[in-house]
Amino acid sequence: ETTPVVWDSGCLEEVCGACTMVINGKVRQSCSCLIDEYAPNDGDTITLEPMSKFPVVRDLWVDRARLFNALKRVKAWVPIDSTYNLGSGPKESPEHQQTRYTLSECMSCGCCLEACPQYNLEEDESKWDESFIGAHAISQARLFNEHETGKRLKGDRLEELSSKGGVNDCGNAQNCVKVCPKEIPLTESIGAMGRATTIHAIASFFTGKK
């Protein structure tokens, strides 16, 4: 007697990223995978595997806690002080809005991390903050640094990306952008944040401020 196979799921429409797994060697969301796409002929085999860069909880279900920890490292949120009215936000050009909207589509699925040769399984939680942070967190740091309110934490994010496991640990394999289900320009974000950390380091050296 066998028990049902366990996997994670949520939205069933490719917006939450919970069901991400490796299907016939390719990392993707299982909810949008059609049988006919991978097994068009009778007798074809479909192989399902859990992502290899995260600890397996059971069967196809993995623990993505390290992925979310990386978002905490770069403070991927907009700081809000509710003690006073901030008023209306500044106007943005349609081009800037579109850039940020594209970056905001990240669903923290882990595809980019699974494909990245620099990102490896690390089950020791004490080492997470010194391991490569990953393309998703770098891109989200860019998103919030370009937000008029979010950029209040810009210096903190750049400091984190300048530290061990930050943007300089990227090997430029560009696998991340090839597997991203939302086609987010991850390599552009990595390049942009690499330049930003360099400018930040030079400015900090001369001003003494971080």
Give the label of every model feature segment:
Residues C31-Y38:
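A short, sequence-level motif marking secondary-structure junctions
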Residues I23-G25:
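Short strand-turn-strand beta-turns centered on an Asx-Gly dipeptide
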Residues A39-T45:
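Extracellular interaction modules
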Residues L12-C16:
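FAD-binding core of FAD-dependent oxidoreductases
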Residues C19:
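Conserved phosphate-handling catalytic cores of large alpha/beta enzymes
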Residues E1-P4, I35, I46-K210:
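Ferredoxin-type iron-sulfur electron-transfer modules in oxidoreductases and energy-metabolism complexes
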